[in-house]
């Protein structure tokens, strides 16, 4: 009887929604839909009351002498579940077929999950996002992050980064769909209580519209299933999550592209985007704007063997310079623009017990190669913090990466991020032109799984990098980090499940700092910190 009451209650609330969704045209405004929903609710209530009364008459309580059942672990199941802890598995929706009463019930069952998806699809609006925030304190005053891109993130980041995406379907008829997408990202300061955007002391509080584009399906006859987009958007990013930088990243001021175009066994992503840069002179005080354009091409999801896929990628960036810009480079001390490229491949292997590992190989030249040589963050940018400078001479850099997670038995999981890279005759932002470098960084994160909601573990990070300048002088940078943590989670995966709340204690030490001269507070080369951090996406 309890279950019937719940279903009946769900009928009163949900059935009018399903009824109206089938009968309304998508051209109606939200206000018109609400008005019709209210009307449908009033009309349906009387009919449902009659249906409820009939159900009550059919139900005759019976006294049955039965033993208390037990579950698989031997504990007695509760024979009298409380109503406050339960919710219906399904709702009933009214069928609109004219002959429904002749063939059977005029109602059919729909799970709450399916019904929620139906309402969401009917509205055509979604709100997605990400942010992290937390508290921390350290042994020498204010805690400082160091070399996150080499030592790992746990217990080593004190920023409040966010991404917020709004997506609205504006057309969906005759096999064609159009969506409007806007994304904002930025950072909220975690040091001072006030965090007004524009009042940017310390560079903490900022925000931008990173995406603003229209994406469509069904308009291209040769690729009806692909996503065709126009606007401020770039090719999809691929991240080394534990190090917080990207192996694939093409920023864009505006562009046009195609994603998930099925060709042969795999899919093609292609993007043509604009990303102008500020070209500086040798004093780094004066700048000029240079128009650059990037083509990013990827052939992905190529099946290899069981649960293994391959991606092949290529990217080329070229400038569209005016005569005056070239004259400034030739005669006024501005750095010459040099076209730059990157190509490579990646292999992703999923495991039977859950988890995955991704291996990538990338080669780049000129300014992208310069960013391969950065130890703190190594995303493949064409600039350094938005500034283009340096005598690039065609030097190249190579990068090999591994990242993923694996389950060991029922109660252990290990995540990893390992990067080996080297370069020859590149421009280094620390040691100048004609530099060589070699680096290795490794982070492992084993943990004990108590249950679905709790893990305890340690993140261990180490890196070392050596640069050699044009005069063969050597400069070394190295350090290590140990972070003990306990996390509250909603699933056991370390890399793919959020939200997550972390409690941590971190010891971090700079062994050598000849590239950046970094120190913690009080000129110390080490730091002990404790804190808590929340990270969520939806």
UniProtKB/Swiss-Prot annotation:
One of its GO terms (molecular function) is carbohydrate transmembrane transporter activity. It is found in: Cell outer membrane. SUPFAM superfamilies: Porins. Residues 62-73 have a biased composition (Polar residues). Residues 1-25 form the signal peptide. The keyword Transmembrane applies. May be a sugar porin with a broad carbohydrate specificity. This is Putative outer membrane porin BglH. The lineage of its organism: Bacteria, Pseudomonadati, Pseudomonadota, Gammaproteobacteria, Enterobacterales. The gene is bglH.
């Amino acid at each position: 009887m309890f279950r019937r009451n719940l279903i009946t209650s769900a009928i009163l609330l949900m059935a009018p929604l399903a009824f109206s969704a089938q009968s309304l045209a998508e051209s109606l405004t939200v206000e018109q839909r609400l008005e019709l929903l209210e009307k449908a609710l009033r009309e349906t209530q009387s009919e449902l009351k009659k249906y409820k009364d009939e159900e009550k008459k059919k139900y005759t309580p019976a006294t049955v002498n039965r033993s208390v059942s037990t579950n698989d672990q031997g504990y007695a199941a509760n024979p009298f579940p409380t109503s406050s802890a339960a919710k219906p598995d399904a709702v009933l929706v009214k069928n609109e077929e004219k002959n429904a009463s002749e063939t059977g019930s005029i109602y059919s069952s729909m799970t709450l999950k399916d019904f929620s998806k139906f309402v969401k699809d009917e509205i055509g609006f979604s709100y997605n996002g990400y942010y992290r925030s937390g508290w921390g304190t350290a042994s020498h005053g204010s805690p400082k992050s160091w070399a996150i891109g080499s030592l790992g993130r746990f217990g080593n980041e004190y920023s409040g980064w966010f991404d917020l995406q709004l997506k609205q379907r504006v057309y969906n008829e005759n096999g064609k769909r159009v969506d409007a997408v806007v994304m904002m990202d930025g950072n909220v300061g975690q040091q001072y209580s006030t965090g007004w955007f524009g009042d940017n002391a310390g560079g903490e509080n900022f925000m931008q519209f990173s995406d603003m584009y229209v994406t469509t399906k069904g308009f291209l006859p040769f690729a009806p299933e692909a996503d065709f987009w126009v606007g401020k958007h770039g090719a999809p990013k691929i991240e080394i999550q534990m190090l917080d930088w990207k192996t694939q990243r093409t920023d864009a001021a505006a562009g046009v592209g195609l994603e998930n175009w099925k060709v042969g066994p795999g899919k093609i992503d292609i993007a043509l985007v604009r990303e102008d840069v500020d070209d500086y002179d040798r004093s780094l005080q004066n700048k000029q704007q240079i128009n650059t354009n990037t083509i990013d091409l990827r052939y992905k999801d190529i099946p290899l063997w069981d649960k293994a896929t391959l991606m092949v990628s290529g990217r080329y960036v070229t400038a569209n310079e005016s005569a005056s810009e070239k004259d400034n480079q030739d005669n006024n001390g501005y750095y010459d623009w040099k076209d730059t490229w990157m190509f490579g491949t990646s292999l992703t292997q999923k495991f039977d017990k859950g988890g995955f590992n991704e291996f990538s190989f990338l080669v780049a030249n000129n300014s992208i190669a310069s960013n391969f040589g950065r130890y703190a963050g190594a995303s493949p940018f064409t600039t350094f913090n938005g500034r283009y400078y340096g005598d690039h001479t065609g030097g190249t850099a190579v990068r090999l990466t591994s990242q993923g997670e694996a389950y060991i038995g029922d109660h252990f999981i290990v995540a990893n991020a390992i990067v080996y890279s080297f370069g020859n005759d590149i421009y280094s932002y620390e040691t100048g032109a004609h530099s060589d470098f070699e680096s290795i960084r490794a982070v492992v994160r084993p943990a004990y799984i108590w249950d679905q909601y709790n893990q305890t573990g340690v993140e261990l990070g180490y890196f070392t990098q050596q640069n050699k300048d044009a005069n063969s002088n050597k400069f070394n940078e190295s350090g290590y980090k140990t972070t003990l943590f306990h996390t509250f989670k909603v699933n056991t995966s370390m890399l793919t499940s959020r939200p997550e709340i972390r409690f941590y204690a971190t010891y971090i030490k700079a062994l050598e700092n000849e590239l950046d001269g970094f120190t913690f507070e009080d000129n110390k080369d080490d730091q002990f910190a404790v804190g808590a951090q929340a990270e969520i996406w939806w």
